[in-house]
Structures are given as C-alpha cells and as structure tokens.
Amino acid sequence: MFAVQEDDALIELMRAIAQHDQAGVAALLETDDGLASARLNAGATRQQAVEFFLTEISHHVYQGDTAVHVAAAASEPAIIRALVEQGGPVDATNRRGARPLHYAVDGTPRSVQEQDAQRQTVSVLIELGADPNVTDKNGTTPLLRAIRNRNAA
C-alpha cells in the first residue's frame, strides 16, 4: 500500500494505533527505539490519496506525520502518553503544518464514549505541552478546527 520502504515499520505502528491495538503498539515500540519519534517520508497527495487512508479512523496520513499524529486522530490518549514517553514529539508538524492537536479535534464523535475519548486526547496533548494557539499552513488553530467541526473537545 505505502510506497516508501523505510516507512514500513512506522506504517505498521500507525495501523496498530488506528485499530486501537494497544498491545500491538507496545510490541512494535519495543522492537524499534526510534519508532515513536519517526516521521512519515511519504503521504497523501491529490494524486495519491487512497493508499494513504486509514479506514479504521477515516483519516489520511501526510508526509511528516508521526505516530502521535495518528494516535491523536484515533483519540488514543494512553497511546499518546506511551509515544511521548519514548520520544514522540507532541508538537511535530507535517507537510500541511498540522500538529497532533489539530488532528485531535478533527471529525465529529458519533457517541458519548468517542466524545469523552476526544476530550481526554485534547487534555493529554495540552498537558504534555501541545500549543493550542499554533496555526497550520492555512492559518487555522486547533480551536478554530474544533469550532468548524462543532466539537465539544
């Protein structure tokens, strides 16, 4: 699916996160010290979108994304903590200027449980040092994204 060979381990980690597989994530992190801080070398573009789509969480990944980005999109605060403990960057920027906190407020939760997970994710990211006032390349802050998506997070 993903074309860049050196991204294979990171893609495997991102898939485990998207599948909410905490045991799988832990096992992958044990095998590679640098995986928590690795950045994706390739990602979705207008020409190549389908192969960079994580169906489980309805989310594209972009060049520069980290596992923390995907954990934020998947509303997995425990995984975010584990990644940051192993060097995962809480404020990494992808090619679109988006940081994990931008991803955490994307999408609309379909249940109270998902809404709670999203709130916890946002809280954990801010607690760990994510800047809620940072803008992406379009000048959008995480707060503005949350408002646009009508999120309570």
Named regions from a protein language model:
Residues 6-13, 38-67, 93-110, 135-141:
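Ankyrin-repeat boundary/"N-cap" motif
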Residues 22-29, 76-84, 110-127, 151-153:
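Ankyrin repeat structural motif
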Residues 1-19, 24-27:
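N-terminal capping/linker segments that flank leucine-rich repeat
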Residues 15-20, 58, 70-76, 103-118, ...:
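Ankyrin repeat A-helix N-terminal signature
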Residues 125, 133, 138-153:
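Short, intrinsically disordered, charge-balanced linker/junction segments flanking boundaries
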Residues 60-61, 70-75, 82, 91-94:
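Short, charge-rich binding segments
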